[in-house]
């Protein structure tokens, strides 16, 4: 499952956070 916050950051439930280009 992947969740995107309001700032467009890709937050995965495995704890990794990635910036959405």
UniProtKB/Swiss-Prot annotation:
Biological process according to GO: monoatomic ion transport
GO molecular function: porin activity
Keyword annotations of the record: Cell outer membrane, Disulfide bond, Ion transport, Membrane, Porin, Transmembrane, Transmembrane beta strand, Transport
Domain of life: Bacteria
Membrane topology field: Multi-pass membrane protein
Compartment annotation: Cell outer membrane
Keyword Transmembrane (UniProt): yes
GO CC list: cell outer membrane; pore complex
Subunit structure: Disulfide bond interactions within and between MOMP molecules and other components form high molecular-weight oligomers.
Purpose: Structural rigidity of the outer membrane of elementary bodies and porin forming, permitting diffusion of solutes through the intracellular reticulate body membrane.
Protein name, as recorded: Major outer membrane protein
Organism: Actinobacillus equuli
Organism taxonomic ancestry: Bacteria, Pseudomonadati, Pseudomonadota, Gammaproteobacteria, Pasteurellales
